[in-house]
Regions:
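Short, low-complexity N-terminal tether/leader segments at secretion or assembly junctions of large
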Residues: 1-34
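C-terminal, surface-exposed recognition/capping segments
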Residues: 49, 53, 223-224, 231, ...
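Long, low-complexity, polar/charged, intrinsically disordered or flexibly structured peripheral segments
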Residues: 89-93, 102-126, 149-153, 305, ...
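Conserved SET/PR-domain catalytic core that frames the SAM/AdoMet-binding pocket
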Residues: 135-142, 359-362, 366-377
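Eukaryotic short linear interaction motifs
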Residues: 145-147, 180, 228, 371-372, ...
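A short, polar/charged loop-to-alpha-helix boundary motif
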Residues: 380-391
Length: 466
């Protein structure tokens, strides 16, 4: 018998096993035990936040996954070294782009699968970024939670129902802001919004855009669908500073100035002329140009840049449509039109110049230089956050109703600045990763790395698409 061999006796029979074999058997048994536990208790992937730094520490089954996420995404161009372990971990692996049939969605019945309205998945031959009903993001069912312990905030995602965890049902959300169009629905001409390519629907009241969505049998994003995306993103990228880890969004495509005047009058022309010192860096294809009689206004109209050229001190901007302007008209730049960004697909990151293109989290443009209305969360005049108790309540209202919406007791900061402290409405039982700023005084890098804006009156809680 060789040194290191082990003798196993069973019913009086002896067998000799090499020590390496027995070690392998022990590992197999340990793996089996782990798999059995996961089958009962679920697979848990989490992060721990110290509330001082944006960077987090991984926990649970994610503990051995690197927090260096450079190759989890695309940055500027397609990443040849792309390697994201979460691509093979549920529920992240199941989040993907799809085309839907709006007509099929409108007739879904209670109990039907949300995927019954899907007509093509990303990768299918008939999937299209130019589909008549737009491009959507499917997120599969999962469970999640967050809690304080020992001075840390823990976030956890699980693939099984766990007592006390928030249940996130399978859902489909818009990839981008909606584009407004008119359709005949039930025999009537109605304005609707769909996540298609082109000019996003902006400068409309929340109630108006909500009506457009409901005209098509849809709704707007709620605090609950947003919460699902935030939780998945926090656990995957292990960092609260999403602009640093994933991409800034179109924060640099912004210009409003008293000196932002048209430099030459034109009649029914697709070309406007402006000072190069103001516009040269912003006049990129797809940038949204507002022209108006006041700074930042669009009384004349909203257009986008097709091309631009500079000669001396003047930049000539070719627009997508003809316009009549005088030298008394102002121009401003507000973000970017919706483009396909096919190289990103269902992945994360950005294609283009950081700050001048959309940034995506697993296919969804979550932030950019435009406000996004979120149903179901409101700030009251007492600065408290009020929440809709159910998805139905979130969809039924687009303004605060204190007889329906619940006071969470979370008081928002009354001043604007970088976020220092986040408030978590524990009693809601519906949110695991809410983003309510209760104290400012942080920085552009920590502990969250984002800015908090507030309003003096009761209003919807909005998500800045940054």
């Amino acid at each position: 018998m060789a040194t290191g061999d082990k003798i196993v006796t069973l019913d009086g029979l002896k067998a000799v096993y090499d020590s390496q074999d027995t070690d392998s058997i022990k590992q197999d048994v340990a793996d089996l035990k782990s798999n059995l536990e996961a089958a009962v208790n679920g697979h848990h992937y989490g992060v721990r936040w110290d509330k001082a730094s944006a960077q987090m520490t991984r926990t649970g089954l994610a503990a051995d996954i690197t927090t260096t996420t450079t190759n989890f995404k695309h940055s500027g161009s397609v990443n040849a070294n792309y390697n994201n372990p979460f691509d093979s971990i549920y529920p992240w692996s199941g989040r993907k782009l799809c085309n839907i049939s709006l007509n099929a969605y409108r007739v879904l019945q209670s109990g039907d699968s949300i995927t019954d309205c899907v007509v093509a998945w990303e990768g299918d031959p008939d999937f299209s970024y130019e589909h008549e009903d737009g491009v959507w993001v499917y997120t599969p069912e999962f469970w999640g939670t967050s809690y304080d312990e020992g001075g840390y905030r823990y976030f956890d995602v699980c693939d099984k129902p766990i007592t006390g965890y928030v249940h996130y049902p399978a859902h489909i959300t818009a990839r981008n802001l909606g584009v407004k169009e008119t359709r005949t629905i039930d025999g009537a001409s109605k304005a609707i919004v769909l996540p298609k390519l082109g000019m996003p629907c902006v400068r409309e009241a929340m109630s108006t855009i909500h009506t457009y969505a409901k005209n098509g049998g849809m709704t707007l994003d709620s605090i609950y669908s947003l919460d699902a995306s935030i939780l998945l993103m926090l656990v995957e990228f292990a960092n609260y500073n999403s602009q640093s880890t994933i991409g800034q969004g179109t924060v640099s495509l912004y210009y409003e100035n008293d000196a932002g005047l048209i430099q030459e009058a034109a009649t029914s022309s697709t070309v406007i002329k402006v000072l190069a010192s103001q516009a040269q860096a912003l006049a990129i294809p797809g940038a949204i140009i507002d022209i108006g009689t006041s700074k930042g206004g669009n009384q004349v109209g909203t257009y986008h840049v097709v091309s631009a050229s500079t000669s001396g001190t003047i930049t000539s901007i070719t627009l997508n449509a003809a316009v009549t302007v005088t030298t008394d008209h102002f121009y401003s730049v507000h973000g970017h039109i919706i483009v396909a960004d096919e190289s990103i697909g269902s992945m994360s990151g950005y294609i283009g110049t950081d700050g001048k293109c959309d940034a995506y989290y697993r296919g969804e443009s979550l932030w950019g230089n435009m406000w996004k209305y979120v149903l179901g969360a409101y700030k009251n005049t007492d600065e408290h956050v009020y929440l809709a108790a159910t998805d139905a309540d979130a969809d039924n209202y687009d303004a605060i109703n204190t007889s329906v919406h619940l006071d969470t007791g979370v008081a928002l900061s009354t001043t604007q600045n970088y976020i220092k402290t986040l408030g978590f409405p524990e009693q809601s039982g519906r949110l695991a990763a809410p983003c309510f700023c209760t104290e400012v005084g942080g920085s552009s890098s920590a502990p969250v790395g984002d800015y908090f804006y507030t309003n003096v009156s009761s209003c919807p809680c909005s998500d800045r698409r940054w």
